Amino acid sequence: MHSTGYCQAVEKAGGIEVPRRARYIRTIILELERIQSHLLWLGIAAHIIGFDTVLMQAWRIREPVMWLCEKITGNRKLYGINVVGGVRRDIPKAMHPELMGVLGRIERETKAVLDAVVTDTTLLARLANVGVLPNKDAIAYSLLGPTARGSGVAIDIRVDHPYAAYGEVETNVMVETSEDIWARTVVRIKETLDSIRIIRDCLAMMPEGPIQAKITEPIPPGRIGQSSVEAPRGETHHYVITGEDNRPYRWKARAPTFQNLQGVPIMVLGETIADVPIALGSIDPCFSCTERLETVDVRSGEVKVYTKADLFRLCKERWSKR
């Protein structure tokens, strides 16, 4: 997700046209990432509420997806598939039947999970009417991804501002309106199934041609490029200013967790302590994406923002004085 966002920002800054085939391959990898991420989340969420049977089943279904990622890119994670101007590796037609077979198996098993989720009384008791995030608050706090869509907000960068091959391949925005953890769960499972369909469509519609643009000149300094990508957790935005020697002068990324955390206090208000972990977990937080902390001195009113590096430095300094 992040490499796509970064590359697209640089490509916009440099006026680089990515070949259509490369855009289709990017879309396939992005949707494989969405599938494995949602299944990973489903297992962790089930573990949080003590339902380890779902954890084991979700991660069992996820494993062939990881195998597909490795088959295509050479890596289970940190795929390294994107380069500025295209992709590093192709998906030849000879690989298509194998991919389609694995996708069919994943689809059947994910449908079984969806059927279980919507009817299982234990899951409904723990997830329905828990961690409620009203639609108006999801809009007011500009929440993103499944967190927003579970509260009835039809927002999805793939549809609102298409990139890669999403302007050519049908993409459905999965929305639920019960505004609770159950809704966020159903949104993710339905998105998993739609991602499988998107990959199939990409394989069927993939055009012939090169997978990398011919870039013959350095990108001039002072150019600005921005790009948004619909990550599994929601919109990820990248901002790039080009510098000298074909290097970035400034690069800023905003991950969706930073925005979605704003909704957690509303979700947990009035809930039991036992429901706080799953309410927080329902946004699929990535705390390494939000490594900053704001503190307010209650005596002076002074406000300070600390990064992860600042906090580690202060921690080491304190212990070195003991």
What are these model-predicted stretches?
Residues M1-R322:
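Active-site bordering "gate/hinge" segments
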